[in-house]
Amino acid sequence: VLNACYDVGIVKFFNSLKWSTMSTIIVDKIAKSFGATQAVQDVSFEVRPGEIFGLLGPNGSGKTTSIRVILDIYQPDSGSVTILGGPMTNEKLNQIGYIPEERGLYQDVPLDRCLTYLATLKGLTEEQITERLPKYLAKFDLTDHAKKKAKELSKGMQQKGQLIAALIHDPEIVIIDEPFSALDPVNTQLVKDLLIEQRNAGKTIVMCTHQMNQVEQLCDRLVLIDHGRVLLQGELSEVFDRFRTNEVIIDSLDPLPEELNGVSRIEQLNGGYRLTPQAGLSAHQLLDELLAQGIKLNSFEVAVPTLDEIFIKVVKEGNGKHE
């Protein structure tokens, strides 16, 4: 009996470790078409425990189809999806919290009853719901609105209600589409803090959004898809490094002349200039050139492209390949 208990303990121990050593979601060369429309083609990416992963792309790019394949709503025409070490099962579905872009609260049911019902579908007991639901309602400042029907709530309140529905069963994976829609700045920060809290707890978070500033602040890695194909993926820092240029932004004490040695292009900005060095000249060498020409500087910094700029550039280049 002791040996049996020991063996069971070992199994539980290694089961508790397994998601820290492998990807929780593996999407491998999936393809999905609807009639003559190829929605997704040869899409591959992995999502790891303890990270916020950005799934990005323009409208109609294939993001939603990819999510529905992951959730086993759609069967792929080819390729495969591995969830928590294997194929999707009903048990694994209960380890996923999903918020679609189309909101899903029952409009004619009081919020607390709706959330209780949804939590029951995810396998929570009455005791667990009684313990957890009041805490989440308080966290999202919804306690005083719990008896209101969803249709009586603002869009922001409904969004927070859906977040509760997605998180109350403590899932391993959270997939959330446009998490900040309809939220004011205070509640946006609340949701950001919550996502970071989930990441720090080792959860896997997949976030679809068009708000690139939120991706920059939250995501560890990302994939960008368009026309159903992967255009770009990697760690956020790697993506920025890949698109970094030698362009610099300066603020000078005096207006710049129209031409400068070592500079191929001068663009006037609001309160400064963007300079493009001549070919083969580094930003550091350009600084030396400017100082040698007597340019007096208040500031000098290497220009880092925003994720918005990278997004637009990559999508435009991708569209060019499809023309």
What is each PLM-predicted segment?
Residues 245-318:
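Short, charged/small-residue-rich alpha-helical element at the C-terminal edge
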